[in-house]
């Protein structure tokens, strides 16, 4: 390992928002506060590491009071783009702000999309075509799917075309091929993501697997990731990061099977990588607990993150940075099972630098601007806070 290490780690706690944005009511999300409401629903959280880093300053979290002398810099970021989904949030982090929201289909997909999908994939038809919870719809339609071979197609409040299939009925590679075809069909419709949703099990006890795969629209403009790669800076995408950016601006991909695996792989990665950006998505918060309105599970996942952080923090030295944030909210305490329009936390660990208040940032793109300045590449969107965390 080189003694001249220069690494920046971004951990995205997927959906861990910290309070409704001013326009949240327009999205049906007034009062949402994923971290705060989760803490109160379970009678308090135990997050000693994150608490010392200053997480208690970003919103009122039961069990995590504001630390008077935090060890990291703390703040929160507001989303400037229209929307509240994974793609929009991650793209904005890396400097692409969407002025027009990506298209959603609250009444299902029109016949011309489904007819093209069936014709071009050779699938025997589709089931569903509705807004649904993925874990619910596979229980409702899984048996019919296995009997007919028809994939289950559904969407949500986000810009997604989701295709669920049992791995014994539709082999994984066939499902991926169908989703690649759907991606091509849906590009003109401005659908952010096509998501392959494989599942296993028997009627009444179907379960989704970690072999989900996202097929994203390419970002409409160059991201900070692409500029890093052009400048020769390695960019390692961990979890679903490569999928979100259509693999643009990624030099290495690491697949994960949940948050614990993602944290362990990130720590191991830091033992062999001495330069570049390590960009990590931890999806369990959103996939397993937020959408399922499970505050107890969400709380356990936050505590798991807290336990896993030291192994990563201990591998970073002077001049290196770690930023912990989120891409949107998904408050498990509200009636909705969809994402919520929220601020996201910003916790920045700069070894040897202590902590301080970064305030409320006007856009997620401030993070990308900071990454760009750290590695010496340009960015047009956002205001870097690098000087504030390295002074």
From Swiss-Prot:
It catalyses: 2-deoxy-alpha-D-ribose 1-phosphate = 2-deoxy-D-ribose 5-phosphate; alpha-D-ribose 1-phosphate = D-ribose 5-phosphate. It is found in: Cytoplasm. Pathway: Carbohydrate degradation; 2-deoxy-D-ribose 1-phosphate degradation; D-glyceraldehyde 3-phosphate and acetaldehyde from 2-deoxy-alpha-D-ribose 1-phosphate: step 1/2. CDD domains: PPM. Pfam families: Metalloenzyme (PF01676). Binds 2 manganese ions. Its cofactor is Mn(2+). GO terms for cellular component: cytosol. Residues 76-87 have a biased composition (Basic and acidic residues). It comes from the Bacteria. Its EC number is 5.4.2.7. GO terms for biological process: 2-deoxyribose 1-phosphate catabolic process; 5-phosphoribose 1-diphosphate biosynthetic process; metabolic compound salvage; nucleotide metabolic process. Isomerase that catalyzes the conversion of deoxy-ribose 1-phosphate (dRib-1-P) and ribose 1-phosphate (Rib-1-P) to deoxy-ribose 5-phosphate (dRib-5-P) and ribose 5-phosphate (Rib-5-P), respectively. Belongs to the phosphopentomutase family. This is Phosphopentomutase. It comes from Anaeromyxobacter dehalogenans (strain 2CP-C). The gene is deoB.
């Amino acid at each position: 390992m080189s003694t001249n290490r220069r690494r920046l780690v971004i951990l995205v706690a997927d959906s861990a928002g910290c309070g409704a944005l001013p326009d949240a009511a327009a999205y049906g999300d007034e009062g949402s506060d994923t971290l705060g409401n989760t803490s109160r629903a379970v009678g308090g959280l135990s997050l000693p590491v994150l608490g010392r880093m200053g997480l208690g300053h970003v919103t009122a979290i039961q069990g995590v009071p504001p630390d008077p002398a935090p060890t990291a810099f703390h703040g929160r970021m507001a989303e400037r783009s229209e929307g509240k989904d994974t793609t929009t949030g991650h793209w904005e982090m890396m400097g692409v702000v969407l002025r027009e929201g990506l298209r959603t289909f609250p009444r299902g997909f029109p016949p011309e999309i489904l007819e093209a999908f069936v014709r071009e994939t050779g699938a025997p038809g589709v089931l569903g075509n509705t807004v649904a919870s993925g874990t619910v719809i596979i229980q409702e339609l899984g048996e019919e799917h296995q009997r007919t071979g028809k994939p289950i197609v559904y969407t949500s409040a986000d810009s997604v075309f989701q295709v669920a299939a049992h791995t014994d009925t539709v082999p994984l590679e066939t499902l991926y091929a169908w989703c690649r075809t759907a991606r091509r069909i849906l590009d003109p419709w401005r659908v952010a993501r096509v998501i392959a949703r494989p599942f296993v099990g028997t009627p009444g006890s179907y379960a989704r697997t970690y072999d989900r795969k996202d097929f994203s629209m390419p970002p409409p403009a160059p991201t900070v990731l692409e500029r890093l790669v052009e400048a020769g800076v390695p960019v390692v995408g961990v979890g679903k990061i490569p999928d979100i950016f259509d693999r643009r601006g990624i030099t290495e991909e690491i697949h994960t099977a949940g948050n614990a695996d993602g944290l362990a792989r990130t720590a191991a990665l830091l033992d062999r990588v001495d330069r570049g950006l390590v960009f990590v998505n931890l999806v369990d918060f959103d996939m397993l607990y937020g959408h399922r309105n499970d505050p107890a599970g969400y709380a356990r996942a936050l505590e798991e993150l807290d336990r896993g952080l030291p192994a990563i923090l201990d591998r970073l030295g002077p001049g290196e940075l770690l930023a912990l944030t989120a891409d949107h909210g998904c408050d498990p305490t509200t009636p909705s099972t969809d994402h919520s329009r929220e601020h996201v936390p910003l916790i920045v660990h700069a070894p040897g630098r202590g902590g301080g208040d970064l305030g409320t940032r006007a856009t997620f793109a401030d993070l990308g601007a900071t990454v760009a300045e750290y590695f010496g590449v340009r960015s047009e969107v956002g205001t870097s806070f690098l000087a504030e965390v390295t002074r």
